[in-house]
Amino acid sequence: MYGETGTGTWYPHQFGGECVDGRKALPDLTTATLDKLDWTPVLEVEVPGIEVSPQMCEPNRIQEIIRPKEIKQIGDSIWLVDMGKALNGWVELSFPKLPEGHRVRMEYTDWLNENEDFKPQEENGQYEDWYIGSGQGKEVFRNKFNHHAFQYIRISGLAKAPEEVTGYLIHTDYKDASSFECSDPDLNAIYAMIKYTFKNLAFSGYIVDCPHYERMGYGGDGNASCKSFQTLYEGSSVYMNWMQMWQDCIREDGGMPHCVPNPYPAGGGPYWCGFIITGSWQTYLNYGDSRLIERYYPVMRHWLRYVDAYTVAGLLKRWPDTDYRAWYLGDWLAPAGVDYTAQSSVDLVSNCFISDCLTTMEKLSLIHISEPTRQAEIS
């Protein structure tokens, strides 16, 4: 039932969408129906030098059903749907009868412009789905192989308003672990905002930087958000899965990417790579789960040997860009007036972090290895 378009790539603003052709919709998924189809042979592809582990945490599941706040017509056969709040997930739309072959376009965005008109998420981005009418009565579109982060939907090519619009908030099926309420409504709102934000970011077994632009599991974001997420949610299995992805991505020489999954050379620095250490330690502190330490301690040591190779007179210096990693950042969000690109600033921040990593490794060694072995490592 899928049309001629692909589903995009894993590059910023290029995640694409789905083109569903109602004319190809199957009446059912029984063996008899499926056997009548002309199936394309399965292709086996060998990708050398890449480790890929199965996702070892809860799957993504629908967590909340969201109804639109408003549906209004903004042009000839054009409708604007306001879901009332942002969400990361799927949309389902029921259309009145469409002519066979008629195309309906759905575009997604987080915001409106100053005139409260639809503002594209990115001028050259791909954030849209298409539905092609079957001409057979009531038509229904629902995402199956892609997802979007949005609050607003612009529907074009529809003479009448959609009969029904439903949003599905989706995230990894981790459980709630916190509650908070006080007499200050602002603090209550901040707590609710942070908690809901994570529901849109913790997706597919790791935490993304943004669910629309990049969908990348940056180690820097992981470090910055770890304590908050692990306080709010029971996420030990999410971090186990995420740390396994870091192990899969470490190179033979001990070099680490700045994010996992690692589809292209993304930006970062030591604070990003060292998440394998700090994330494992924080998971132990929050959940008492020592499995990450036991499993990934050798990976941490391997990376620190890579750090040592670029250490001069006791201080880490810039390592080179590679085909899997770019830039060399220190404080990515420095206060106004601080030149975060200055090498002195980058070196200061990076070496402070490495110092913290080494201190943490000493604590990890108390848990993971015997005292004689630990003393031998220290000496």
Language model segments and positions:
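Extracellular/oxidizing-compartment recognition motifs
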Residues: M1-P211, S237-M240, P257-P261, R291, ...
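Aromatic-rich carbohydrate-recognition surfaces in CAZymes
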Residues: Y131-A161, D186-I190, F198-F203, R215-S365
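Single conserved hydrophobic/aromatic residue that forms the stacking wall/gate
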Residues: I367-I378
